[in-house]
């Protein structure tokens, strides 16, 4: 454990809360101290849910540690059952409560509660939130699901969407429509909006659609083995992946593939002259493994970007992400330390970042546009409107989300470029009152340091002079990083310690040859 101001994933019990909050008729009794109730805010404030998570905390305090905290848990469990009357209960301990080793699962088995009580063993100091969600859903399915006769019509289950997931609500709607077009109905969506009764009939479907491997792959593998239900391997994010997904579903279900792409608006732009503006833009990707793998394919094959770096924070997806990075000829960054991510972005100087909420902050600090592609996200990425990531409409949404920071950045660049202009600077007043505006006082020219004598020896550390920094800001943001790198390389190779405006333009002339 370490002290940090940001974490990509919470402890495993937060993953369990995501599953419980997504479901109905399920209640989570969490053995936890008073301070661990912060997790409620994730769902009510950030996801903007209209109800609190179905979680009851024991909320023991320091003074309780001198008495029997086990009795406190038993009383809390009984009270939760009596008050909420759920169809099933899950019980576990938070990271802090794990240290006192009260064994909530063992205690719950001795109480004779007349509904399924599912114990969770979540190693808080070895694993994190996505593992917690995956393990929780697996334990629920393993306890409640049973083999049964298949439905007469071809049906499938959509598995993986949880509370606090990135656009999970809208992805469900989009995939339901895609499958309906092929004559396939949805039997159960789980965990999102499912009840324990729904989980009990999950075995009636012919196959499973694994939407998010991070939160449901263990359950999908178990159902394939125990219930005889194959599951899809393709995540339909992007045009190419959606077409591959349709083909995979058709093969599993034995139906004809069909995709209504009349709503698809991304390919026409890729064929247009305007799209050459995006070709070759250098992008860096970071997030959970599923979304990064999908986004890398879209960036390279559908948008014409150059992927200069990628990585993920969940180590469970490290192997496929590393394999993808090798295909791109780059090295994957597998870390949950946002400072390492910032250092890599700073070193690569991409023209755009595709990441999480943290990368949005990093982009603001470094002056690099950013689009969010993965959880964790903040409130603005839980929109009230329909905004999926999967399927046809998801491809349209991704197209808008990625292109707008680059296109709108041009307007912002022009505003910054003319910020010091005699007519448009901040002190000039409204432009239509130009004749009455006070004449701006001429600023004292900043003294320039004497240029360092050129040295043909080894490279030196270079410093940007103020006037050169101002001139650099006049260069459009999408090539500014490249201009900075080239100028610093040019100065370093020639032993110039301070970069002036002249050095900047000499470097430009040198690399233009």
Curated annotation (Swiss-Prot):
Biological role: Component of the dark-operative protochlorophyllide reductase (DPOR) that uses Mg-ATP and reduced ferredoxin to reduce ring D of protochlorophyllide (Pchlide) to form chlorophyllide a (Chlide). This reaction is light-independent. The NB-protein (BchN-BchB) is the catalytic component of the complex.
Name the UniProt record assigns to this protein: Light-independent protochlorophyllide reductase subunit B
Gene giving rise to this polypeptide: bchB
Compositionally biased tracts (Low complexity): 440-454
Superkingdom per UniProt: Bacteria
NCBIfam families: DPOR_BchB
Provenance organism: Roseobacter denitrificans (strain ATCC 33942 / OCh 114)
GO molecular function annotations of the record: 4 iron, 4 sulfur cluster binding; ATP binding; metal ion binding; oxidoreductase activity, acting on iron-sulfur proteins as donors; oxidoreductase activity, acting on the CH-CH group of donors, iron-sulfur protein as acceptor
PANTHER family the record matches: LIGHT-INDEPENDENT PROTOCHLOROPHYLLIDE REDUCTASE SUBUNIT B
Cofactor note: Binds 1 [4Fe-4S] cluster per heterodimer. The cluster is bound at the heterodimer interface by residues from both subunits.
Region called Disordered, residue ranges: 426-457
Gene Ontology BP, a term: photosynthesis, dark reaction
Gene3D superfamilies referenced in this protein's UniProt entry, alphabetically: 1.20.89.20, Nitrogenase molybdenum iron protein domain, Proto-chlorophyllide reductase 57 kD subunit B
Active site: 274
């Amino acid at each position: 454990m370490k002290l940090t101001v940001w974490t990509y994933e919470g402890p495993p019990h937060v993953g369990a809360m995501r599953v419980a909050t997504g479901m109905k008729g399920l209640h989570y009794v969490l053995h936890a101290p008073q301070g661990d109730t912060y997790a409620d805010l994730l769902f009510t404030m950030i996801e903007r849910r209209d109800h609190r998570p179905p979680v009851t905390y024991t909320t023991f305090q320091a003074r309780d540690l001198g008495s029997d905290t086990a009795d406190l848990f038993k009383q809390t469990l009984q009270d939760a059952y009596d008050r909420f009357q759920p169809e099933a209960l899950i019980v576990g301990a938070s990271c802090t409560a794990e240290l006192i080793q009260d064994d909530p699962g063992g205690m719950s088995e001795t109480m004779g509660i007349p509904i399924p009580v599912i114990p969770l063993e979540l190693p808080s100091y070895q694993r994190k939130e996505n593992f917690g969600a995956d393990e929780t859903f697996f334990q629920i399915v393993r306890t409640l699901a049973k083999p049964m006769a298949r439905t007469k019509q071809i049906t499938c289950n959509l598995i993986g969407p949880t509370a606090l997931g990135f656009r999970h609500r809208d992805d469900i709607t989009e995939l339901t429509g895609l499958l309906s077009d092929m004559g396939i109905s949805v039997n159960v969506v789980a965990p999102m909006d499912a009840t324990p009764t729904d989980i009990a009939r999950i075995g009636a479907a012919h196959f499973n659609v694994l939407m998010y491997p991070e939160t449901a792959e263990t359950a999908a593998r178990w159902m394939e083995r125990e219930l005889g239900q194959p599951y899809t391997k393709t995540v339909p994010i992007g045009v190419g992946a959606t077409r591959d997904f349709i083909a995979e579903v058709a093969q599993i279900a034995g139906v004809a593939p069909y995709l209504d792409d009349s709503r698809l608006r991304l390919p026409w732009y890729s064929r247009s002259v305007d799209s050459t503006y995006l070709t070759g833009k250098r992008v860096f990707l970071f997030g959970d493994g599923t979304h990064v793998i999908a986004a890398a394919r879209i960036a390279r094959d559908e948008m014409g970007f150059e992927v200069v770096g990628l990585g993920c924070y969940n180590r469970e997806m490290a192997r496929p992400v590393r394999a993808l990075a090798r295909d791109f000829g780059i090295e994957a960054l597998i870390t949950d330390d946002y400072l390492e991510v910032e250092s890599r972005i700073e070193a690569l100087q991409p023209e755009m970042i595709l990441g999480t909420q943290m990368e949005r902050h990093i982009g603001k600090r470094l002056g690099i546009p950013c689009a969010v592609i993965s959880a964790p996200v903040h409130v603005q990425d839980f929109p009230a409107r329909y905004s999926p990531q999967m399927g046809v409409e998801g491809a349209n949404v991704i197209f808008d989300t990625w292109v707008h920071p680059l296109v709108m950045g041009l307007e912002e660049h022009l505003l910054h470029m003319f910020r010091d202009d005699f007519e448009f600077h901040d002190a000039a007043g409204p432009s239509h009152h130009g004749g009455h505006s006070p004449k701006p006082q001429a600023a004292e020219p900043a003294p320039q340091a004497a240029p360092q004598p050129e040295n043909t020896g080894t490279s030196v550390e270079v410093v940007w002079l103020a006037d050169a920094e101002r001139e650099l800001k006049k260069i459009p943001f999408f090539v500014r990083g490249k201009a900075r790198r080239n100028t610093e390389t040019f100065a370093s190779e020639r032993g110039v310690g301070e970069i002036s405006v002249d050095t900047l333009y000499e470097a430009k002339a040198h690399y233009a040859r």
